[in-house]
């Protein structure tokens, strides 16, 4: 059974976990803020299943996962760098759907070129909106133009947050 590792299991990570469980993967996660996550799958006929997941260590997620997906807030340092790539399973894949600058892209290229990492999918990258040419042209890296927040729900939350910030500044309410 393939193992699907999540780094970050908040609201978005839990939605991604549903996909992994739904396709029959063994889902593990590491989250600095959540020790457990309850993943509920609702089916078209009204049935539902619930899965309780316990947080694993960061190193376990790296070393045991066939696929790693990242869903964490912005950071001022790399979360995936030389040492983390060394710990990852041979031939694994990595997806960054959180923030640019989370993965050291030079190390990512080295690890893809060596075969240690088989593929990457990146929605956010360093130097947005222009990825490095090595990232852009690598046949084992799929890029999307930071569209992860392009859902209706995300746009609604952004609108409310902006309105709250404007209100705080202008003191209307």
Question: What residues fall within each predicted segment?
Answer:
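Conserved acidic E/D residue at the C-terminus of a beta-strand in Rossmann-like folds
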Residues: 31
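Glycine-rich NAD(P)-binding loop of Rossmann-like domains
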Residues: 1-15
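Rossmann-like adenosine-cofactor binding region
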Residues: 34-133
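Residues at the starts of beta-strands that form the adenosine-phosphate
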Residues: 3, 22-26
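Gly/Ala-rich phosphate-binding loop of Rossmann-like dinucleotide-binding domains
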Residues: 17, 21, 112-113
């Amino acid at each position: 059974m393939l193992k699907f590792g999540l780094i970050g299991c908040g609201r978005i990570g839990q939605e991604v976990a549903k996909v992994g469980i739904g396709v029959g993967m063994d889902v593990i996660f590491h989250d600095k803020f959540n020790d457990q996550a309850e993943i509920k799958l609702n089916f078209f006929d009204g049935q539902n299943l619930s899965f309780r997941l316990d947080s694993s260590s960061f190193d376990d997620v790296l070393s045991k996962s066939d696929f790693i997906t990242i869903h964490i807030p912005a950071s001022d340092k790399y979360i995936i760098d030389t040492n983390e790539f060394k710990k990852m399973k041979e031939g694994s894949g990595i997806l960054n759907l959180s923030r640019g600058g989370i993965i050291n892209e030079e190390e990512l290229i080295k690890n893809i070129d060596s075969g240690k990492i088989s593929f990457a999918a990146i929605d956010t990258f360093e130097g947005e909106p222009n990825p490095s040419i090595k990232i852009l042209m690598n046949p084992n890296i799929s890029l999307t133009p930071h569209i992860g927040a392009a859902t209706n729900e995300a746009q609604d939350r952004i609108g409310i947050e902006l309105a709250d910030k404007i209100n705080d500044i202008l003191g209307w309410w």
